[in-house]
Amino acid sequence: MIIVRSMEEKEISSMNVIPLVDIMLVLLTIVLTTATFIAKGEIPVELPEAKSGKAVQPQESVVITITKEGKIYLKSREVSYEELKEFLKTLNRQTPVEINADKNAKLENFVKVFDLLNQYGFKNVNLLVKKE
């Protein structure tokens, strides 16, 4: 008696994981790439709109952000009002300063920061807005 086995009946002794590893590496690459863009992130601020205004020439400037919650950020790092004061004391008065205030931020917070800049003699101060 002759027993013939077809190829379909062959027992699988182990699973081939190479395709799984390939897919995982592709997914890891995608996640790391998108995480880089997210990590650069910005502080979520909704800029007010204005009909007038002009584009500012890109140069090394200090960006002060005021959120609608009243938090102050200096170069994407949250700081207290006192820390901002200390930083501005050491800064060259000719350095351009950009105020990036949320349109729903309290006017009081904006005025405090703007007054501080005037108090220390900063003349090159810009308010960032979104063009209508």
UniProtKB/Swiss-Prot annotation:
Regions crossing the membrane: 18-38
Topological domain spans for side Periplasmic: 39-132
Superkingdom per UniProt: Bacteria
Record membrane topology: Single-pass type II membrane protein
Keywords: Cell membrane, Membrane, Protein transport, Transmembrane, Transmembrane helix, Transport
One GO MF term: transmembrane transporter activity
GO biological process: protein transport
Compartment(s) of residence: Cell membrane
Pfam families reported in the protein's UniProt record: ExbD
One of the record's GO cellular component terms: plasma membrane
Cytoplasmic side: 1-17
Function: Involved in the TonB-dependent energy-dependent transport of various receptor-bound substrates.
PANTHER family: EXBD MEMBRANE COMPONENT OF PMF-DRIVEN MACROMOLECULE IMPORT SYSTEM (PTHR30558), TOL-PAL SYSTEM PROTEIN TOLR (PTHR30558:SF7)
Summary of subunit composition and partner proteins: The accessory proteins ExbB and ExbD seem to form a complex with TonB.
Family recorded in the similarity comment: Belongs to the ExbD/TolR family.
Name recorded for this polypeptide: Biopolymer transport protein ExbD
Originating species: Aquifex aeolicus (strain VF5)
Lineage of source species: Bacteria, Pseudomonadati, Aquificota, Aquificia, Aquificales
Gene: exbD
